[in-house]
């Protein structure tokens, strides 16, 4: 069985033979694409009369090849993906004027150390061990939210500075993806109701039994449940929760989509950080991990900062150099 590097070369050299005749003169390339927490390798097949082509990520196709060990079958799957993605791309014609973009830019948080390569190519600013990046929301429908990461080139070509993106995104995120703080009880009850569980059964299970606020877990996300960890940047929500609980908070980054807030009386931050690390490594996919650290919110100072400092391992478990600065910085570019 060929390794992944050889697989990429074989696909690149042979894919045109598996595509329809109109692709005969297409140009083929394979290139690395920095994504959140990882780098993927994409195949592009550019038709002669087009100025863009979809990325077909080869990691997934390589998994298919490992399962069937038949390169011809896999090439046929890749070809089908190319044709389908090219058709879909032709249907999408987003308006790229500056007004449309500035009204639909939202905040997203990623881990700084794990995303060094990605951060070279995108406008960003540091926040503790994380970085704020920006996504342009192209469409929202019943299937979810379609968005793209804004790159340096994209921003420069449309006249946006990082500061302008930040200011637009702070306001837009509250409108497009309103922050939401709910107790874990409420979240579990909502999920159970969505699954059709009767109210009476939920009550008999004690789902609605009152738990003191300082003993509860609180989920900080947004109404979409997508990239909701950025909601921790809205300090007024943290302050309101801390006042309700009556103590400072520890924030546990469960994924890029949400964080869990608890009273500081719930345990030592080092213990909580170990729990976050263990969950990250066993239950959260690499592309959705945010941090192995825990954050402390001081309700009197109204300040959010790191409670722990465990940068010795990246989110993929690889030993990493410790970042030198954890304080919030100004625009990175």
PLM-predicted stretches and their roles:
Residues 278-279, 283-298, 302-304, 310-312:
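Helix-rich interaction surfaces within compact, conserved domain-sized segments
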Residues 221-226, 230-231:
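Long, intrinsically disordered, charge-dense linkers/tails
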Residues 1-36, 41:
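N-terminal alpha-helical "arm" segments
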Residues 26-219:
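Charged, alpha-helical interface segments at or near domain boundaries
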């Amino acid at each position: 069985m060929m390794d992944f590097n050889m697989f990429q070369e074989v696909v690149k050299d042979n894919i045109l033979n598996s595509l329809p005749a109109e692709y005969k003169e297409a140009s083929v390339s394979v290139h690395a694409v920095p994504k959140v927490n990882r780098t993927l390798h994409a195949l592009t097949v550019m038709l002669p009369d087009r100025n863009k082509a979809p990325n077909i990520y080869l990691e997934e196709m390589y998994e298919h090849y490992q399962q069937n060990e038949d390169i011809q079958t896999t090439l046929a799957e890749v070809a089908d993906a190319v044709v389908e993605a090219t058709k879909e791309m032709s249907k999408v014609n987003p308006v790229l004027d500056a007004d449309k973009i500035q009204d639909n830019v939202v905040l997203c948080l990623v881990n700084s150390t794990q995303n060094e390569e990605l951060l070279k190519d995108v406008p960003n600013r540091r926040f503790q061990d994380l970085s704020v990046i920006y996504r342009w929301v192209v469409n929202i429908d019943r299937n979810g939210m379609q968005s793209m990461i804004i790159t340096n080139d994209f921003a420069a070509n449309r006249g946006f500075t990082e500061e302008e993106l930040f200011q637009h995104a702070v306001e837009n995120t509250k409108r497009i993806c309103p922050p939401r703080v709910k107790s874990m009880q409420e979240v579990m009850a909502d999920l159970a109701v969505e699954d059709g569980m009767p109210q009476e059964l939920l009550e008999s299970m004690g789902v609605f039994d009152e738990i003191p606020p300082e003993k509860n877990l609180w989920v900080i996300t947004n109404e979409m449940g997508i990239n909701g960890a950025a909601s921790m940047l809205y300090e007024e929500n943290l302050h309101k929760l801390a006042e309700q609980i009556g103590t400072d908070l520890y924030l546990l980054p469960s994924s890029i989509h949400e964080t869990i807030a608890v009273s500081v009386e719930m345990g030592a931050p080092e213990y909580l950080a170990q729990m976050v690390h263990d969950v990250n490594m066993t239950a959260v996919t690499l592309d959705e991990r945010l941090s192995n650290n825990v954050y402390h919110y001081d309700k009197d100072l109204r300040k959010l900062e790191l409670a722990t400092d465990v940068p010795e391992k990246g989110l993929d478990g690889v030993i990493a150099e410790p970042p030198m600065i954890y304080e919030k910085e100004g625009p990175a570019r």
